[in-house]
């Protein structure tokens, strides 16, 4: 190929590469949504399990999921810890302790940090650590592994 044609050919190849990349980027959300929707299992929430969307319903829904997975705990044990940790606020976040200083603040009803939430997440619940049922269930799973049950937790854990 003559030297004069080389820059024009390189420009054409770069243009094709950019166009192909752009097309792929535009197609990803459509392809991903189709694939993800087909593979996404149903998530248990208080309302999907027939309970009210409040603290009582969240605890009862969590107990139902916990029962299905053999995670011990009682209504009173969960309630006591929720009130101490977040006063029942599912959006509570601790921005002042050592976890927060390390960039992983405690979140949700039972003030779980993200690494613990991910490690003790229970299938069938949301992966959102602020989701009340997912937060309670993961925290109870952690408490069961560490203390035998959430019922045995009487302070920060």
Please report, for each region that a protein language model flagged, where it lies by residue:
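N-terminal prepro-regions of secreted/extracellular proteins
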Residues: 1-52
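Peptidoglycan cell-wall recognition and remodeling modules
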Residues: 53-157
